[in-house]
Amino acid sequence: MNEFPHIRTPAVAGLFYEADAGGLERHVAALMWAVRPMAQPATRAFIVPHAGYVYSGITAATAYACLAPIRDSIRRVLLFGPAHRVYLEGMAIPAADIFATPLGDVPIDRAGAARIAQLPDVIVSGEAHRQEHSLEVQLPFLQTVLGEFSLVPVVVGRCAAGSVAAAMDALWDEPGTLLIVSTDLSHFHSYEEAKRIDSATCDQLLARSTGLDGEQACGAYALNGLMHSARRRSLQVELLDLCNSGDTAGDRGRVVGYGSFLLH
């Protein structure tokens, strides 16, 4: 690491989650306490949502609680999520050496990130990561459950499923590595319409479809890459929780869908 490391500071602390370390610790602990962990020692990957914690925190916690039985075996997290703040063709790894949160610093696995950067469709872009919330909101959960770990964060723009799968596969099989894909589901439909759309999307994920689009999930490109790799590996997709903002903290006129899944 550089003598003066490049640190990505939090972009959405105080917006999507508490900026105060003590308040954030208490909120994450409460979310984790509220869900029942499902022991899955063969877990290879998770799909988790990325809205503000009052909206999707409980759905995310349902996945992160499953890490408890295997936490000691995980030393590195590959984290893929969609680009919301910049237009991006392909994928981007950060220029930063550290991602900071109110709970502390998460070191970037620069060697692992450099290997992904050698692939076609991958660039190094600090700007793609600077304001991106889809990856950042996962970090306090990971810090709470895992303690110390290194991170390979990848922002995904418009990209073929095979290219995304290749980026995942570059490091996924190495010991101590967990893969997480961050995505929300449908956006801004009525409560009942969102339930219909998200249920159909869930069925496609359970069938490992690589044909998802942005109307179904903002992380469709990352999900299609994950499903591409999951098919090749004969992994199964299991639903942990499915809801929308009308079930948690929002009105039911215009809702956003959330789901958590594990792959084993």
Feature names for model-found ranges:
Residues 2-250, 262:
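Active-site histidine-anchored catalytic micro-motif
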Residues 255-260:
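Short hydrophobic/aromatic beta-strand or adjacent loop that forms the aromatic wall/cage
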